[in-house]
UniProtKB/Swiss-Prot annotation:
Its EC number is 3.6.1.7. This is Acylphosphatase. GO terms for molecular function: acylphosphatase activity. It is an enzyme of class 3 (hydrolase). The gene is acyP.
């Protein structure tokens, strides 16, 4: 496992709303890669999408803003009603996957 810079952080965001079957995970991946973040976007059985992103804290916070902003300034697909965030230490993930 590679060492992470101390300013790196892990964001886990549970996105509620109409976010499955609309290209939301693809959009999230494109935004995360644009920001230089690693992680994943995963459909959950209850209709939410779980977004995990690791990287510099300011970029993770920017992704969080993009996930929930109303109206979206970044052409976000779907309709987001709520985003629940959790912060933790990074685990050293690489790339960004849609699951």
């Amino acid at each position: 496992m590679s060492m992470q810079p101390t300013d790196h952080i892990r964001l886990t965001a549970f996105v509620h709303g109409h976010v499955q079957g609309v290209g939301f995970r693809w959009w999230t991946r494109s935004q995360a890669l644009e920001l230089g973040l690693a992680g994943s976007a995963t459909n959950l059985d209850d209709g939410r999408v779980c977004v995990v992103a690791e990287g510099p804290e300011d970029r993770c916070r920017e992704l969080l803003t993009r996930l929930g902003e109303q109206p979206s300034r970044h052409r976000r697909v779907g309709t987001v009603s709520t985003v629940i965030e959790q912060w933790s230490e990074p685990r050293g993930v690489e790339g960004f996957t849609e699951r």
